[in-house]
Design a protein with these regions (language model features):
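Short hydrophobic alpha-helical segments enriched in small aliphatic residues
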Residues: 3, 8, 24, 29-32, ...
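N-terminal presequences and immediately downstream first alpha-helices
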Residues: 45-61
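Conserved beta-strand hairpin/beta-sheet module of binuclear metal-dependent hydrolase folds
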Residues: 67-129, 253-263, 269
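Active-site HxH/HxHxD metal-binding segment of metal-dependent hydrolases
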Residues: 113-114, 120-232, 259, 268-270
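Metallo-beta-lactamase
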Residues: 102-112, 213-222, 230-232, 237-275
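Short Pro/Gly-enriched beta-strand edge/turn motifs at strand-loop
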Residues: 51, 73-80, 207-214, 234-236
Length: 275
């Protein structure tokens, strides 16, 4: 694995700017980019010179992997589904093959079911080829819940942006009081929430905590990801594209050769991602 910062390029202007500033338009110089969002893989085609020449979203890979199942979506890129509580039911996780092992992108929540699935995958997949790096696209517990367990098991580094890492650390430190106590009630009341709904909010956060959806404790150190940084993994260059809105400093990974963007929650094809 090789990491190198680069100067702004036309690719960054095309991909990064349009990713953040144009709703529904994701442009690639090759004019046909597959975008891997957190629920589906989809493709969109757009003429860079004529922005009216758009096509509806299509899904080149229709079959979603079952929970705990791994499928290959591109050379050296594998797609894994992990369970999460609630109606969304699953989170996408990615495995990137390197010369000396594997990288994991995002982790699933911190509960027994997900831990057991990872332990099975460790035995089946990573006995001879260990995990050499973990990337968390952003701070939310369905993406970071197993980060500490994975990094400690393989003694591998965690890669995140600074804004996501330290926000997660701050939330984890006061997770017990921020929503369920009087501070949380006062916050929601000032935001306009009816008094009779405050009790339901407290119950909801208590339930989420029991399901592993509270903010986990991250490893004590991390490797910082920055805009336009390039991670070379298994011969593929993955450029870091930073977004915001859904979370403070969300990291997407774009590989021009594979025409593949791992978008985390910055782009969602079904529900609305706050951007």
């Amino acid at each position: 694995m090789c990491i190198s910062p680069t100067h702004p390029t036309a690719l960054k202007v095309q991909l990064g700017r349009n990713l953040r500033q144009r709703h529904g338009c994701y442009i690639n110089a090759a004019n046909a980019t597959r975008i891997h969002a957190d629920d589906k893989i989809y493709s969109t085609t757009m003429n860079v010179q004529n922005t009216s020449a758009t096509q509806p979203i299509s899904y080149p890979i229709e079959a979603h992997p079952d929970v705990g199942e791994i499928i290959e979506i591109a050379p050296g890129v594998q797609w894994l589904s992990m369970p999460i509580p609630g109606s969304l039911a699953f989170i996408n996780v990615y495995l990137l093959r390197d010369h000396n092992g594997w990288w994991i992108v995002d982790t699933g929540v911190s509960n027994d079911q997900t831990t057991q699935l990872w332990q099975r995958i460790f035995t089946e997949r990573f006995t001879d080829e260990p995990v050499v790096g973990l990337i968390c696209t952003h701070m939310h517990p369905d993406h970071t819940g197993q980060a500490r367990m994975i990094t400690e098991h393989f003694q591998c580094p965690l890669y995140m942006t600074r804004g996501e890492y330290y926000q997660a650390r701050a939330f984890a430190n006061n997770a017990g009081e921020s929503h369920s106590g009087w501070i949380g009630q006062r916050f929601y009341h000032r935001a306009g929430m009816p008094a009779d709904f405050l009790e339901e909010i407290g119950k909801m956060w208590s339930k989420r905590s029991n399901e592993g959806m509270s903010m986990p404790t991250l490893p004590g150190g991390y490797e910082r990801l920055v805009e336009d940084q390039v991670l070379t993994i298994g011969g593929n260059d993955w450029r870091v594209v930073i977004g915001s809105g859904h979370s403070p400093e969300h990291a997407c990974l774009y590989c021009a050769d594979l025409k593949l963007l791992i978008a985390g929650d910055q782009i969602l094809p079904i529900i609305t991602s706050n951007v």
